[in-house]
């Protein structure tokens, strides 16, 4: 073992036995000169931190109370450090071997030289130091005589020194003495007697110096503990000092710290009031040298004499009354400097020292009682046999183990009475004290006595653990965890021997609280106080209790968060005995702010708590039904109480500012009691002593002391439902479905339902890819409900033959996945595929009777869509999300009999954001932010974040609208129910305000088993709650009771058995759209290429075509005639209103360029703008319309025909199809294309800078279905339209369908014609959204006539809006990847947006389509019949067009 740094321990001991004769270091002092220079290197390698020049003054100080280091001319020392004589003898043997005298001389000179070297930095002319140790060869002499001789020798030497002006020069004299009997560590009375004895011994010497030496600053230095330490740690060859002052009390760490402080205070009080400090030229200051109460086991190798010199110097730099006095590792190598404000050596006067009166900051209380109001105080009807059904009144015995906080040290001490901290007020102890009653003294024992007045084992009054009044409070002051096993053995022995209790039958509460002292000493011995060792010590003690004590409930209180103690210690306005604090807890209070050592301590504190928790959670102490250990974590996060002024409130502490005051004991008792009633997993982990809370009461719902098993907050759940029977016969209606009727369970969704990362351990990021399907909240079936809470495990409590659930781990294709068909990362667009697979599995698996078994299918989707929405906001729009979800549910509705579908909302992405942002250390930001970039990367208050929130709300709204449409309530054996428990979700928060990452997988995105458990409980609760009253908020940390069906309400709830009426949607006021695009800027300069054309570059808009472009009948209710052309509402050219009220292509473009020209308004010809369409137009009219349009453009003065970019939309062919039956040759596909080509040629020759939309004609097959009598077909159509005359002729209808397809196919080739690709500023792009046109259906699946005007022929405003949206979206889709169908569903957010990556309108070239196709078709067209369409546009539309055409022709 290495020795402590500084003077060698042999040397120190020799120093303490100083030899004879004054000695001064001079260059001519013979052999005595060279030897010390060889032995002591003093401050040669020491970095001097002070800046003397800043403190220099030219005038020498006249007062000792303003004495600066630069004023000192000489350093000297005298002393006697021998053991005091035996009582009554008055003498000490001073004889020492001659060989030691030389070494003693060297040690003394070395220390004085080091001190002199320090002063030399301030005053280079300081003289060589002087040592005047005792004679040692004069035989027997008293200590007083020896000191007298030294003093006289010193004075003589000073007077004879020619370099010293004895009268004017300032001298620094150090008087060394010892108190090696350690009487200063005894009780106050003994200490005072011994102190007076020493004072008498030294008074003569000090009086002599005071009288004889002018201008002197005298240090009175007690090196008692330095000597004791030397004797304890190194063999010196000398006999240890005899114990001549045996203390009446045992010396403990606490008593030693208190007595050290008291000893120093006594010396300072004596000296401050003495005559030695009443003059201007002389002062005596006491400098104590106390060692740390616990020294490090390993210390640096011995250094030179600088250590002791530095300590003397540093003490001189500290104001009297604020000297800490202890030697500690942190200060052994540091030097303090005079400050600008206090550049002098500190005396009692310039320190403003007053006799210490320690007063607490805050209001002191001698006692603190609490009002007890719990109504239910009865015990169990019979003595319980299980600890998990233990009521407070069942407790008959109480006990405790721990340290001084449980022993009650200082709990009842009055303010300022530091010595009384040694008194153990066990009757006031928070966990086991039993003084008085709850009304005056609040303790756990007194709380329990309100339930059972016959409680035994509590401690009363004061005394140590071995006194009768301590009873079963076996806490030992100063104890560490390695002493806990001995306490456990003693407690067991006491209980067994106590005749007043029944050891075998009585229920016992034992509270264990330990660890503060371990932390306080941990930096000095990391092996002894490591977290693992600490936990092992606790385990040893708990093992003893577990093995020996029947019927016991053990509170294992987490070690307290100890660093807040620093706030009290570091606040100068708070009066605390800091020397005691540093002695008791050096490893907390001796560390620098923001130091690595402090960070290590904080981490060690946390590990103590964490490892203790793991020990308890291991289940090691839950193997017997009559014994458990419960972790009570209320001290894990402690807030320092503060006064109204914001200062640390010392009234909560004993006079030593370390132990608890009675007020804190009271509030700790209430906190412990609250913890005991709180469920495991939901216990308070935060303690604010400032707040006095009432005593919590058990209730009928939770009457028992909480254990792991009765808390229902592990991953398992207890089921206490009584109504578990199935229906008398299998129900035929989903509205009379009981839980026990469910025979099959299945699930669809993404990573959450697939179970990714559910059981992954913290930090194991790679394991997140593991799919723990058996633990999935909606589909998992691992183990049983008491171990794993999932929906299937709940349903298995009702029907043990349930099938379909997944077990273990594996992907979607594994056998263990069964009917859990969720796929990690799946999006809404993948849902239909999952549905198809699920249906096929259910049909093919023999365990499932597809037609007879009742099924619960849970669907959860959307989170993955939001993770990627910003990458392609068009693809992941709310409209598309709704469409995909509807398609999947439609398949289930159509294909699956006897099914109840749970549609579960996705978790709001803001939760994931908060977890990431507030836990950057725990969450792997760099690795996983890529997986959910659109959620995790937007800045706070950014536009991107606002868009995320808007998309989230739109997704949720679309789910609600879809279900409440009633679309899935048309069959008696099928229903979709929205389970909204995730609609509003609260972030699980720890007591310190940080998100609780234990609810999440290691990636902080997916959910842990803890969260899945809560999801399962919440889903089950929702399934039993009626519509309109379902829980729509989830706090993962709250206790969710497992609901039960009842006799009155035995069914899983649907809209019908909830007597719920879906809310009637408010009438839609307009068919406008919301504009969410952010990329709106035009090109930096006007583009010269049509392939780099942005929407904002468009200056002119125009259109040509037939009645669809004139918008005839779009708003017939506002006109007396159905023939009115509402050009201002036309899909491709109308400009009435704004986009928010009317969705048209120009209104969309106005968002990019408000100055756009050419759009139509109103109904009059003169406001048609550049809309040249005619109602009855056919393809043959297109060249004429093209000429008219060119003429209009050229004659419009506001249009720059050469520079402005123009957008022309052409749609024709409806009337051609109508007349094809009469004249197939003239209305052939070839003729149709020829006329359109001619019109395009005109534009090609006449107009620069043009982008032309050629829209394919509508797909018109599958017509003439029944319309329910709402749109009876006029007889004129049937009589005059040759096509429809043969509508019953299958061959004729096939021919019509073929021609329709040929027209579309022919137009589709136009985009690739070589002719139209020769100019850089000209492009023709075919927009195919009408190729496959779905019949518009309402929310219940019926024909939706709101798309048409009252004649069921013309498009209504809504129909035009849908066409405008479809056209715009086609324009932003690459050629070859354009949407070829129109989705007639209402959503205000269906408009796509250009993006920074793809800002241009798409042409063949910028779509990266190979130009070979265009070259192939430059001269020859190849016709192809398109694939048969999905369905017709609307019933009767072709007939009406034919009728209309005939009428016009006639």
Curated annotation (Swiss-Prot):
- What catalytic reaction does the record list? a 1,2-diacyl-sn-glycero-3-phosphocholine + H2O = a 1-acyl-sn-glycero-3-phosphocholine + a fatty acid + H(+); a 1-O-alkyl-2-acyl-sn-glycero-3-phosphocholine + H2O = a 1-O-alkyl-sn-glycero-3-phosphocholine + a fatty acid + H(+); a 1-acyl-sn-glycero-3-phosphocholine + H2O = sn-glycerol 3-phosphocholine + a fatty acid + H(+); a triacylglycerol + H2O = a diacylglycerol + a fatty acid + H(+)
Region labeled Necessary for membrane localization — which residues?
A: 1408-1450
Q: What is its EC number?
A: 3.1.1.5, 3.1.1.4, 3.1.1.3
Q: Which GO terms describe its molecular function?
A: calcium-independent phospholipase A2 activity; lysophospholipase activity; phospholipase A2 activity; retinyl-palmitate esterase activity; triacylglycerol lipase activity
Which GO terms fall under biological process for this protein?
diacylglycerol catabolic process; phosphatidylcholine catabolic process; phosphatidylethanolamine catabolic process; phosphatidylglycerol catabolic process; phospholipid metabolic process; positive regulation of acrosome reaction; retinol metabolic process; triglyceride catabolic process
The sequence repeat units are at 41-351, 366-711, 712-1058, 1068-1407
The record places the following residue ranges in the Extracellular compartment, namely: 28-1422
Where is this chain's protein located in or outside the cell? Apical cell membrane
Q: How is this protein annotated for GO cellular component?
A: apical plasma membrane; brush border membrane
According to the UniProt entry, the coiled-coil residues are none
Using the UniProt annotation, give the residues that carry a glycan (glycosylation sites): 32, 45, 179, 699, 787, 801, 844, 880, 926, 1059, 1226, 1280, 1383, 1387
Reported effect, residue 686 to A: No effect on activity
Summary of activators and inhibitors of this protein? Up-regulated by bile acids such as deoxycholate. Inhibited by diisopropyl fluorophosphate.
- What residue spans carry the Polar residues bias annotation? 708-720
Q: Which InterPro entries match?
A: GDSL, Lipase_GDSL_AS, Phospholipase_B, PLB1, SGNH_hydro_sf
Return the protein name.
Phospholipase B1, membrane-associated
- The organism named in the record is Rattus norvegicus (Rat)
